[in-house]
């Protein structure tokens, strides 16, 4: 409650009526939710609690006596032959147990059967079929009447325009949910971002916004889906199956899509087990849900239980803990990832989201902060799904305080004080102190020791973890100062392993300039670029002193790579580590290419297992001879060198007519 909210009960009740009316108008009519569902539910339950104490205050205009918003004026209005009511919600197991007890008491039944199904987070729809043909589709609206969205519904491929069965009722109103699969939503948002168009906040908003387009051509481009789960008008009534589960099976026979995640439940224990089962798999479902629904399975028993003014007495929605909640941004810090990525993180007033107390949420990058206009002091909606890091979804701007502060991205790394860089066309800013930064230390060491870099056998992730955690190694240069005793004392190391690692470290001093450059971990500098740089500059110091214009003269080095190299080399911390490495006895050979006229300028692709060498060794031989080794087969490929167990690359080569040779033939070309 804000500081100016009413305090006495009557005033609080009036405030809730007005506030909920405002929120419902925004949600149902304007399609612009102002609060997460959990916040709306909390306010609505508070209203019901007050009415339970003061039933004399309830009038026909009370929000508890109707379902919600009116139809948009731009669409024709459709009156529902059978009202589209919402469901009562349960948030605690005790409420579910009470629901089961009431049903059994009214029906004088010892045991009940319930149909358990998912509660989708989309838009409720009624489809009216007459003699098997889809004639009208309408939104829920206020429950009594909704919007005619027939033209838009007909664009959804999951919804049949004609039912496929001989025994089709004259009139059948199918109730269900229009929604968007997560993969479709993410793809649509990616495409929108690429075109510079507005992105949707979540799949529910995307589905609702798409369905309520006045131009059905726009809706046709949106990846909407549908699941059937209920029944409206029906003629003749004799068509009606005996149970809800049988109805859904009949829908499937008619060609209607029905969710397979459902089950008939025969006790409270089975109901709670179903709730837990769906909760466990919730984060792996391909669509958003916010709970499960239980319906008395027998239609005869449903009729006996009847309806309240707002919801049926035979059904209940069992909600999961909110995956979105409101809280306040107390501050914005930046974190440095293992690759140097600088990620802004909002420090939040503690809030319960998805059953977990959240105090921090990612803001992704500087552009995202600007796009969402997140400021220190703002009230924000925070979302958490499964193991995904909590994120700030949106800002509640009408709650922004006058003293809210804009965020400024720091220019220096908070861990090592190296300068922060952001290259052209990249959303992520990064710390430039790759060889020195404590946050990047482990990743830098693992890359440095890689077999394609310095090739330090035995220096894997677990050893690196111990070396860094025990402060034995801070930079790659420290590896060459390690003593036998320090290594032998590491967990699961032993004297023999320590001796072997010392030998591997010493052997790595004899390497090539190209491998050394690659081992430094300069962003955008891979093996091939490292070889080109080594061939061009012939020494490490020459590369360290190269400017952007000079770098651009190197084969395949463009502006992004040149900027990355100069940024790395200009950082004093990195230069210091390189000098320490060179002073440790490095002997960096410059490999001379022995150009072979038969392969120079040719493109090779390697696949399968070779009899006398690894693919990496074959690649080195070809590149030294002036050939290029690619990772995939195309029409531009000159040769595919195939060993045993060659896979799809061999098939592709045969399809394209690319010459296929074996290792022996390759060696003949290199002579």
UniProtKB/Swiss-Prot annotation:
User: Which Pfam families does this chain map to?
Assistant: BRCT, DNA_ligase_aden, DNA_ligase_OB, DNA_ligase_ZBD, HHH_2, HHH_5
| Sequence positions that bind NAD(+) | 37-41, 86-87, 117, 140, 177, 295, 319
Q: What protein name does the entry list?
A: DNA ligase
Cofactor(s), by name: Mg(2+); Mn(2+)
| PROSITE patterns referenced in this protein's UniProt entry, alphabetically | BRCT, DNA_LIGASE_N1, DNA_LIGASE_N2
Keywords from UniProt, A to Z, are:
DNA damage, DNA repair, DNA replication, Ligase, Magnesium, Manganese, Metal-binding, NAD, Zinc
**Which purpose does this protein serve, as stated in its record?**
DNA ligase that catalyzes the formation of phosphodiester linkages between 5'-phosphoryl and 3'-hydroxyl groups in double-stranded DNA using NAD as a coenzyme and as the energy source for the reaction. It is essential for DNA replication and repair of damaged DNA.
Principal EC category: ligase
Gene Ontology cellular component annotations, sorted alphabetically: cytosol
What processes does the entry annotate via GO biological process terms? DNA repair; DNA replication
Q: Does the keyword Magnesium apply?
A: yes
């Amino acid at each position: 409650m804000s500081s100016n909210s009413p305090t006495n009960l009557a005033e609080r009740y009036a405030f809730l009526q007005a506030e909920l009316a405002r929120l419902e108008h925004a949600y149902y009519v304007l399609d612009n939710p102002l609060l997460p569902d959990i916040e709306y539910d909390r306010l609505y339950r508070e209203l019901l609690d007050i009415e339970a104490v003061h039933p004399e205050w309830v009038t026909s205009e009370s929000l508890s006596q109707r379902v919600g918003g009116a139809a948009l004026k731009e669409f024709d209005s459709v009156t529902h032959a059978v009202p589209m009511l919402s469901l009562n919600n349960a948030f605690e197991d005790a409420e579910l147990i009470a629901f089961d007890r009431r049903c059994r008491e009214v029906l004088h039944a010892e045991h009940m059967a319930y149909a358990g199904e998912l509660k989708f987070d989309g838009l409720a729809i009624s489809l009216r079929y007459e003699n098997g043909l889809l004639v009208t589709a309408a939104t829920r609206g206020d429950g009594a009447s909704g919007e005619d969205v027939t033209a838009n519904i007909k664009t959804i491929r999951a919804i049949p325009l004609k039912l496929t069965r001989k025994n089709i009722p004259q009139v059948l109103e199918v109730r269900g949910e229009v929604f968007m699969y997560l993969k479709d939503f993410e793809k649509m948002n990616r495409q929108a971002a690429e075109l510079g168009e507005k992105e949707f906040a979540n799949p529910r908003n995307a589905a609702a916004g798409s369905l309520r387009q006045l131009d059905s051509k726009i809706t046709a481009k949106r990846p909407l889906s549908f699941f059937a789960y209920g029944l409206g008008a029906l003629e003749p009534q004799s068509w009606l199956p005996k149970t809800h589960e049988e109805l859904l099976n009949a829908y499937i026979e008619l060609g209607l899509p029905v969710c397979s995640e459902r089950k008939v439940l025969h006790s409270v224990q089975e109901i709670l087990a179903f709730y837990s089962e769906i909760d466990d798999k919730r984060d792996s479902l391909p669509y958003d849900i916010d709970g499960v629904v239980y319906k008395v399975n027998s239609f005869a028993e449903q009729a006996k239980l009847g309806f309240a003014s707002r919801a049926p007495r035979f059904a209940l929605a069992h909600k999961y803990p909110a995956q979105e909640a409101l809280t306040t941004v107390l501050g914005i810090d930046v974190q440095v990832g293992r690759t140097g990525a600088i990620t802004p993180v909002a420090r939040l007033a503690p809030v319960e989201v998805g059953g977990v107390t959240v105090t921090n949420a990612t803001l992704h990058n500087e552009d995202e902060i600007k796009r969402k206009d997140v400021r220190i002091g703002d009230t924000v909606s925070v979302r958490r799904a499964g193991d995904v890091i909590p994120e700030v979804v949106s800002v509640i701007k009408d709650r922004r305080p006058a003293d809210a502060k804009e965020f400024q991205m720091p220019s220096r790394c908070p861990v090592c004080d190296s300068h922060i860089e952001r290259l052209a066309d990249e959303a992520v800013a990064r710390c430039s102190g790759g060889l020195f930064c404590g946050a990047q230390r482990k990743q830098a060491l693992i890359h440095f020791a890689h077999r394609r870099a310095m090739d330090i056998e035995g220096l894997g992730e677990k050893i690196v973890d111990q070396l860094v955690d025990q402060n034995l190694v801070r930079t790659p240069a420290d590896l060459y100062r390690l003593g036998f005793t320090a290594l032998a004392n590491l967990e699961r190391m032993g004297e023999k392993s320590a001796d072997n690692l010392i030998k591997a470290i010493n052997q790595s001093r004899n390497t090539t300039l190209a491998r050394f450059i690659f081992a430094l971990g300069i962003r955008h500098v891979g093996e091939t670029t490292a070889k080109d740089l080594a061939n061009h500059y012939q020494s490490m110091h020459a590369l360290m002193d190269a400017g952007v214009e000079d770098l651009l003269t190197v084969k395949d080095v463009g502006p992004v790579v040149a900027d990355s190299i100069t940024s790395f080399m200009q950082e004093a911390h990195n230069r210091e580590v390189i000098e320490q490495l060179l002073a440790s006895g490095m002997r960096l050979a410059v490999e001379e290419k022995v150009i072979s006229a038969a392969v120079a300028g040719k493109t090779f692709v390697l696949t399968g297992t070779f009899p006398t060498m690894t693919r990496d060794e074959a690649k080195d031989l070809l590149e030294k001879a002036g050939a290029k080794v690619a990772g995939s087969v195309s029409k531009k490929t000159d040769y595919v060198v195939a060993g045993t167990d060659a896979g799809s690359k061999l098939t592709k080569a045969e399809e394209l007519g690319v010459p296929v040779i074996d290792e022996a033939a390759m060696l003949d070309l290199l002579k």
